[in-house]
Design a protein with these regions (language model features):
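Short beta-strand element of the alpha/beta-hydrolase
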Residues: 41-49
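N-terminal cap/lid segment of alpha/beta-hydrolase-fold proteins
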Residues: 1-39
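C-terminal catalytic histidine-bearing segment of alpha/beta-hydrolase fold enzymes
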Residues: 31, 214-271
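Short beta-strand/loop motif that positions the catalytic acidic residue
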Residues: 199-201, 205
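Catalytic nucleophile-loop/oxyanion-hole region of alpha/beta-hydrolase
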Residues: 55-57, 62, 75-111, 248-252
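Conserved alpha/beta-hydrolase "acid-adjacent" motif
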Residues: 206-215
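Primarily recognizes the serine-hydrolase "nucleophile elbow" in alpha/beta-hydrolase
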Residues: 95-173, 177-182, 186
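Active-site glycine-rich loops that stabilize anionic/oxyanionic intermediates
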Residues: 48-53, 203
Length: 271
């Protein structure tokens, strides 16, 4: 465990090299942001967006600080991006959930109240983690991998859910294996066992088509999965909390309050 400058702690997800590690490239880590005044024992693992090319800070640290402000511990997953390809980011997300669940007592969280949250391509990763059930090469190497990897809930912000939504994210994720995109498409993998979802999007998102979110929630509804969806009539892509100088949209800021109420409904907080 390493202490970071802002007071949070950073954990390597594997003690030795991660499966598929490339020398000189990113090491997948999990940054822990504990709430100073906890009001519940749920927690959220955050995956920033960035088309699998980078990770956008306003969609990870910003979310962590917001979750801390409502009394929840949060984790930011520094998952692997290009030149890594599928399934490395998924492997990292599964490992993060297993790591937190394995160490739930140490973190003071309920192992059955671990949500995964993501925006844009990070939303794709969160949804894929919630729907992909096949074993991945590199799993099963230690006792952490024996722990269940499925999150208990998914929080999706303007997510990429299929090729129609944002083809480029799939091209970066899959590289020369783009023709295999169906195996990495949450829309096609969802079933009656998919975790409950909170999702928001804007109807005028010119980057990631809102219709993917509509189709995903419709499919989950047909399977009997609990959904809460908010579609705002106007708004650009990548707003995050919609409250900073670059992404300021007061009307859309209300999604965070709706998320807080949803988390309370599912007993992640008790405020």
């Amino acid at each position: 465990m390493d202490e970071l400058n802002n007071g949070c702690s950073s954990f390597r997800l594997w003690e030795s090299d991660a499966p598929g590690h490339k020398v000189g490239l990113d090491v997948p880590t999990l940054r822990y942001y504990p709430a100073s005044h906890k009001v519940g024992n749920g927690t959220v693992i955050i995956c920033a967006g960035g088309a699998y090319q980078r990770r956008s800070p306003h969609e990870d640290i910003g979310y962590a600080e917001y979750l801390n402000s409502i009394g929840l511990d949060a984790f930011v997953l520094d998952y692997r991006v290009t030149p890594y390809e599928f399934p490395h980011a998924l492997l990292d997300a599964r490992r993060a959930i297993r790591f937190v669940r394995k160490n739930a007592e140490m973190f003071g969280v309920d192992p059955n109240k671990i949500a995964i949250m993501g925006s844009s391509a990070g939303g794709h990763l969160a949804a894929l983690t919630s729907t992909y059930k096949n074993v991945i090469d590199g799993e099963g190497i230690d006792d952490i991998d024996a722990v269940d990897f499925m999150p208990n809930a998914q929080i999706l912000c303007y997510p990429v859910l299929d090729v129609q939504g944002h083809k480029y994210s799939f091209e970066v994720l899959l590289g020369e294996r783009f023709e295999e995109h169906k195996k990495a498409t949450p829309m096609l993998l969802a079933d009656e066992n998919t975790p409950p979802v909170f999702l928001w999007h804007t109807a005028t998102d010119a980057c990631v088509d809102v219709n993917g979110s509509l189709r995903y929630c419709q499919k989950l509804h047909e399977f009997g999965v609990s959904i809460e969806m908010h579609i705002y009539p106007v708004g650009i892509h990548g707003l995050g909390l919609a409250n900073d100088n670059e992404h300021n949209c007061p009307y859309i800021q209300g999604w965070a309050n709706k998320l807080e109420a949803w988390l309370k409904e599912f007993n992640y907080t008790n405020s």
